[in-house]
Amino acid sequence: RELDGVVINEKTKLEETEIPVKTFQPTHVNRNHELFLDSLKLAKLGGTIDLTCEDFPHGLIEDGKDPVIGLLEEARRAGVPMERMTLSSDGQGSWSNYDEYGNLVEMGVTDVGNMYAQLRSLVLNGGFVLSEALSFFTSNPAKALELFPKKGCIAPGADADLLLMGEALALDTVIARGRVMMEAG
């Protein structure tokens, strides 16, 4: 089977090449479960895999059935280091749905708020500790993209990209590169 062009099986192309496994960073691996399971193999070899944040049209998923939470838990049970997992969205990217005949039935734009809503869901619905939930959006992708420690952490010399949150993780202030971009929610 192929994982975004990388064959994953008993004898992978990764084992036959000098290309470092960290070079491969497949995204949207939760678009189907078979792809997700194959991607776990890549993560165990040292690659980083990315799940797409869920669409939260009304804030949190009310019934608590957030599929990303289940997939992260499945990856943990499979022995995947959580440092090998990232979460992202196609914020402001277009999406489309087709019927069984390939006809376009719906199209739209992904909400940039999905990542923040996903963070809240991980903590409030999934029981993730805030520091671990944040790592899927901050330090993990920064390390995978070799931007750490300039990005993905709070440290001297880092860019000072911060979210200040209140109760129930209500967003209060956004700081980017040390400049306040939004204040008082």
What are these regions (language model features)?
Residues 143, 153-185:
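C-terminal cap of metal-dependent C-N hydrolases
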